[in-house]
Amino acid sequence: MASILTSISASISRGTRLRVSKIKRLRSPLALALMGLMLSFGSYRVLALEVGDVAPDFKLQGTDGKTHHLQEYLSEGAVVLAWFPKAYTSGCTIECKSLAENGHLLKPFNMHYFMASVDPLAKNKGFAKQQKADFPLLSDPEKSVAKAYGVLSPRGYAVRHTFYINAQGRIVKIDRNVRPSTSAEDMAKNLEALSIPKKETNS
């Protein structure tokens, strides 16, 4: 069975179809389950966005009671969209806390930042209130935006990826190795490295 699964994995990576004869040879439930998982991950990789791509537009409800439309924010500057798996879980709580407690590192930049998940809005509202988040958490319960960004995992939740979108609507950075405990500090460093301008201040 191992040799068959290796062949399947190679076929997926090459973007080719599985041969019917090989599928018929997979008799056990375990083999079929593994095949389904490989196919899911194969689709996930195909949909992944890359730097330079146009960021998929979105209109999502936020924990602040507003509908947030990407295109409207681009006229004002950059946008950072930080996807997280599930409200109230350990890593997501740490990430949200970092952003909530260190907003002073981010607010000087001419940009808007959000966390986003496929959780229901009511759940994210409670989570945002608990963490005293002073920025909107967006909800994508239909998972359509998560799919468009290529972050929907085979298990149905968003993976922890952060997208940096410039004012022209292009993705200029994707952080696929987010460290929850230093989310704010890392985001500020990335914004600086990307030359995202600071807001004008009255002297």
Task: Map each language-model feature to its residues.
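Short active-site neighborhood of thiol/selenol oxidoreductases, capturing the structured segment around
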Residues: 73-93
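Sec/Tat signal peptide C-region and signal peptidase I cleavage site
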Residues: 44-48
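Bacterial N-terminal signal peptides
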Residues: 21, 29-41
